[in-house]
Amino acid sequence: QENQEQAHNLGIYPVQIDQVETSGFSSKIAWMGIAITYGDYIAAIDSLKTTKDIEYKITTTISKIINAQDNNRQQLYEVGYITGHGEHALRSNPYAQSFTELGCEGLRNLLSDIYSIKEINLAEEEIPASLKSIIINGPVMPFSDEELNKISSFISNGGNVLFFIDPLKELPAEQNSMPQYTANHTGLETILDGFGISIEPKFVFDDKCVIQYQNTGKQIFNWAPIVEKNNVAKKHPVTKNLGGIIFYTMGPVSIDESKAKNAVILAKTSDKSWATDENIILYPGYVNPPSDSTEFGPRNIAVAVQDSSKIVVVSSSIITTDILIRSEESATELFVKNAVDYVNDNDDFCEMRTKGTRLDFISIKSEWAALAIKLLNEFGLALVVVIIGFIAWRMKITRQYLITQKYNPDDERMIAKKSDSKNNGEQND
C-alpha cells in the first residue's frame, strides 16, 4: 500500500493488464512507469506498456527537468514562431480554401512533449534573447526592413532558424476557374542568399510520388514526392535512419557553394522529377511531364547550413500543416520534429527517435510485379494453408498405412489393398 501511494504521488497510476495462464486469462492491476527526480523537479513517464521509444522518452524527460532546474523555468524548451505575414496558424482550420489557410494544430501537438511555442509578431516585438531558435513557416507577405534586420541580428548572435518557405503562392481563384500561382517574394531571399541558398519560384513534380488506388483508377500525385533513403543525408541528425518521407508542393533549392561552404543537402527528389512554373494544375491526371528528357533530374528540396548558427531551409510549408502532420508515426512527422530538435541543439533526440525505424517504401518498378504482389498478399496465405493441409493429410494417410502394414499386416483392409494393387499391376502388364 505504501509503494502504491508513493507511485501515485510521483504521477504513476495503475493500469489493468491481461495475462495468459494455464487456467485461462486473468486480469491484474500494475503500476508500469518511471519517475525521475532532479533537484526540486519530478517527472513521470506513465503507462509504459511497451519498450518502444523508451530510451527516447527517458532521455527527453531527463533533459526537460535538467533544463527546468538549471534555468529556473518551465520544463519545456521554448521555440519562437514568427507571425504577421500570412504564416500558418497553430490551430486547425477545417474551412481552408487554399494552401495558405491550412492550420498547424498537428505541428503544435507534435512538438508539445518537448517544446512550447511562443508566437512573435516582429512588427511589434523583438525576438527574445533567451530563445535558441525561431520557426518561419509559410509567409506569403513581405517582411519590412526592420523585421528582416531583427532576424539577421538574431542569427548573428548565434540564433538558429528553421525556414519553411513556399516557392509559389496561390492567387485567389475566380469563379469556376483553376487556381493560379505566382512567385512568393517575402524579402527573406536576402537572408537566405547570405548563406548561399535560394529557392526557385517553381513547383517540383516527381514520378516517384504518392499514388492512390480508387474505383476510378490509379491517382498519381506528382506534386507529393516520396524521398527514399538513397536521396537523404544519411549521416545528418535530421535525416539519419529516415526514408519514405512525403513532401508536398516543393520548390527547387539552389546552393551557391562559394557562400554555403558547410551546406548539407538533407533531401532531394528522384531522377524522374522536373520543375516548372507553367500550366500548374494540382489534380491527378492533369500533370504533363516535359517532352525533353534533359529536364528530368533530382532537385534539392531541403538544405541545412551550420556555421556560428544553424539554418535549415525546407522549400515548402505544407508538410507542417494538418494534411501531413496527424500523429507521430510517419517519416514526414519525424523529419519535421528532427529539424526542430536540430535547430535547438537537441541532436541526440533525433537519432534516438529514429533508431531502428524502417520507414522506406518498397520499390516496385513493374506494374505486373505490383499486381503479383497484390494477389499474393490477398490470396497467398489461403493458398499456403490449403497446400499445407493437403500435405498433412497425405502424410497422415501414409503414416497410418505404414503402421498397419508393420503391426497388423493380416488386416482385411491391408489384404484388399494389396490385392487391388496386384490386380492393377497385372492389368497394366
PLM region descriptions:
Residues 1-429:
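Short, surface-exposed patches at the edges or C-terminal ends of soluble domains, predominantly
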